Curated annotation (Swiss-Prot):
Keyword terms, alphabetized: DNA-binding, Transcription, Transcription regulation
Pfam hit, one: GreA_GreB
Gene for this chain: greA
Gene3D superfamilies: Transcription elongation factor, GreA/GreB, C-terminal domain, Transcription elongation factor, GreA/GreB, N-terminal domain
Family membership: Belongs to the GreA/GreB family.
Record flagged with keyword Transcription: yes
Keyword DNA damage applies: no
Species of the source: Wigglesworthia glossinidia brevipalpis
GO molecular function, a single term: RNA polymerase binding
Protein name: Transcription elongation factor GreA
Signal peptide coordinates: none
């Protein structure tokens, strides 16, 4: 069975969202449905329809999060023995050999990825190209705009 790699921080964030949806959002939606029922005919009641739609999306998200947490494998970067290679959870500083621009990224699970915050998904082309590589290695990354060469400058395990 395939598992979903996740950092401890990512799992905690999902658990917090799940708690909010179950304990707060659900009761807010139930209250909205109850109030909307008082407006009469449910077939032509826009407030009721909107509340039922919110309920559907909320329950769908709850199921999605529960499934992800059930199938996740929380990876603690500090316990990974490969201290000289790029692995899930490591923070990497790379240099684009064409533009000479340096960037630092952390490889995280799909749900945690946020490119603006330099958090890249384990399933991204950049991560896939970096996994298993060592400091000072040059890697070719296939991107939609062509192959880009990067040099790995530093690997941190934070």
């Amino acid at each position: 069975m395939n598992y979903i790699p996740m950092t401890l921080k990512g799992a905690e964030k999902l658990r917090e969202e799940l708690k909010y949806l179950k304990q707060t959002k659900r009761s807010e939606i139930i209250k909205s449905i109850s109030e909307a029922r008082q407006y009469g005919d449910l077939k032509e009641n826009a407030e009721y329809q909107a509340a039922k739609e919110q309920q559907y999306f909320c329950e769908s998200r709850i199921k999605e999060i529960e499934s992800k947490l059930m199938h996740s494998k929380i990876i603690d970067i500090k316990k990974i023995p490969f201290r000289d290679r790029v692995v899930f959870g490591s923070t990497i500083t790379i240099k684009n050999l064409k533009t000479l621009e340096e960037k630092t990224y952390k490889i995280v699970g799909d749900d945690e990825a946020n490119f603006k915050n330099n958090l890249i998904s384990i399933s991204s082309p950049l991560s896939r190209g970096l996994i298993g590589k060592k400091t000072l290695e040059i890697v070719n990354i296939n991107t939609p705009s062509g192959i880009i060469k990067y040099k790995i400058l530093k690997i941190n395990y934070l």
